[in-house]
């Protein structure tokens, strides 16, 4: 039963992320109505009762490194090719994530597996819910 409860936390994080699709994005916003990329991951984890760091750097350094991401895991990317993590999305399973692109856009769902943009930029996944 305990394992099921932990898995439910990952599912809850993913469901919360999906519920925020089409919410506006704004640099520095951590919800509940506007988000930046690390604000979205922070908010979704907090609604599942999980405390994670607020900053992207700290989020990428914490948690447990996961080889195969599941719903609720955080996905980290180097989108500018400088060898540094500069972006995070929330895995919702099946090779998909929810993320908050730059200010003035909307939170959206995207494939990060077999995707010409996201796949080469993907670096690792972290789990905070287990």
Each language-model region and where it sits:
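Aromatic- and glycine-rich peptidoglycan recognition patches
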Residues: 1-4, 8, 50, 57-58, ...
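Short, positionally conserved secondary-structure boundary motifs
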Residues: 8-13, 41
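Catalytic cysteine-centered active-site loop
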Residues: 19-71, 79
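Conserved acidic residues
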Residues: 70-73, 123
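Short, surface-exposed beta-edge/turn micro-motifs
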Residues: 71-72, 86-88
